[in-house]
Amino acid sequence: MISVNDFKTGLTISVDNGIWKVIDFQHVKPGKGSAFVRSKLRNLRTGAIQEKTFRAGEKVEQAMIENRRMQYLYADGDNHVFMDNETFDQTELSADYLKDELKYLKANMEVQIQSYEGETIGVELPKTVELEVTETEPGIKGDTATGATKSATVETGYTLNVPLFVNEGDVLVINTSDGSYISRA
C-alpha cells in the first residue's frame, strides 16, 4: 500500500478494479476542510483517462508492473510477434492492442513489454526512433522560408511534417511521444 501523498508521475496503482498510471497529480489544501490529492490517471488496459480525487493520507495499492526487454520480429497478418531477449520466448500482440505504436515499429526494434500478473498491458517504445523517408516532394533550391514544412511518409507508413530540405532516402529521428520530427540521423 502507498499513500496518495507519495504520488509521482509514472507511478502505477490498482484502484477500482483497474490498473492505472498516474499522469498528473496536484496536492490541494483548501482554506476550509481537509486536504486532498487531485489526480489524472490512465487505464493501462483500455487507455482511457480519468480524473480522480483522493483524501490526503488515503492508501491505495501499488501495482507491480513487470518490464521485459523484447525485440519486435515481424507482422503475421493482424498479429505482431515479439521475442524475449533473455528466454527467446515469442509473444503475439494484435494490431488493435498496439494502436499508436504501429506507426514506429520496425523489424528488430527493442521495446519494453509491460505486464501485470502475467497479463500484457502495454508496450513502451524508445523515446526516439530512426525511420527512412519513402515518399516526399523534392526540396526546391531557394525554398528556404523560415519554418516551412512539407509532409513525408516513412517506411512504416506513418506521415509527418518535416522541413523542406528532407528528401526521399533520408533517415529521420522521430519523437515517439508526439510523432514529431527531431532531426536527420
Swiss-Prot record:
Transmembrane segments: none annotated. This is Elongation factor P. GO terms for cellular component: cytoplasm. It comes from Staphylococcus haemolyticus (strain JCSC1435). Involved in peptide bond synthesis. Stimulates efficient translation and peptide-bond synthesis on native or reconstituted 70S ribosomes in vitro. Probably functions indirectly by altering the affinity of the ribosome for aminoacyl-tRNA, thus increasing their reactivity as acceptors for peptidyl transferase. Its main location: cytoplasm. GO terms for biological process: peptide biosynthetic process. The keyword Protein biosynthesis applies. Pfam families: EFP (PF01132), EFP_N (PF08207), Elong-fact-P_C (PF09285). Pathway: Protein biosynthesis; polypeptide chain elongation. Belongs to the elongation factor P family. It is found in: Cytoplasm. Keywords: Cytoplasm, Elongation factor, Protein biosynthesis. InterPro entries: Elong-fact-P_C (IPR015365), NA-bd_OB-fold (IPR012340), Rib_uL2_dom2 (IPR014722), Transl_elong_fac_P/YeiP (IPR020599), Transl_elong_KOW-like (IPR013185), Transl_elong_P/YeiP_cen (IPR001059), Transl_elong_P/YeiP_CS (IPR013852), Transl_elongation_fac_P (IPR011768). The keyword Glycoprotein does not apply. One of its GO terms (molecular function) is translation elongation factor activity. The gene is efp.
